[in-house]
């Protein structure tokens, strides 16, 4: 079993790492193609359903994820891609919190058919990171396990 690490590296940043069983090309596709992304991104144990997933993975392109969380209105996450380097790097803004949201940066480093995935969440302030809590970061272990399952199915 692969180990996912979650580390608060500064007052403004959390870093999640895991080596997954698949080439960087497939991992990049899993992050950028909606039909693949929706198969692994939401931890099953959270009981949330992804209602819609739009990913326009190019610099300046937009993404939007809408979840059914059992309430009256869906919960949405959205932002803009600021860096898209095929098979090695992605970065996007997280704009659902208003001005000054966090930025997510994903780097991929392939070695021997396996890929080290590093996800950096950088917040505008310590208070913003504190407010975000650790729930989403803690769910990343399950999320990455689901990514590994998907990569196995894709071969």
Enumerate the language-model features and the residues they cover.
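Hydrophobic/aromatic beta-strand elements that line small-molecule binding cavities or substrate pockets
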Residues: 18, 52-55, 77-83, 94, ...
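Hydrophobic ligand-binding cavity/cleft-lining segments
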Residues: 1-47
């Amino acid at each position: 079993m692969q180990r996912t690490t979650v580390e608060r590296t500064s007052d403004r940043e959390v870093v999640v790492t895991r080596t997954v069983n698949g080439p960087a090309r497939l991992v990049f596709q899993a992050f950028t193609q909606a039909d693949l992304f929706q198969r692994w991104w939401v931890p099953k144990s959270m009981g949330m359903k992804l209602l819609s997933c739009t990913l326009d993975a190019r610099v300046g392109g937009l993404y939007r994820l809408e979840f059914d969380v059992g309430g009256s209105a869906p919960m949405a996450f959205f932002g803009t891609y600021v860096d898209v380097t095929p098979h090695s790097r992605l970065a996007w803004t997280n704009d659902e919190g208003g001005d000054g949201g966090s930025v997510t940066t994903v780097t991929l480093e392939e070695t021997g058919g396996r890929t080290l995935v590093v996800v950096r969440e950088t917040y505008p302030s310590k208070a913003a990171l504190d407010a975000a809590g650790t729930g989403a970061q803690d769910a990343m272990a399950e999320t990455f396990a689901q990514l590994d399952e998907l990569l196995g199915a894709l071969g």
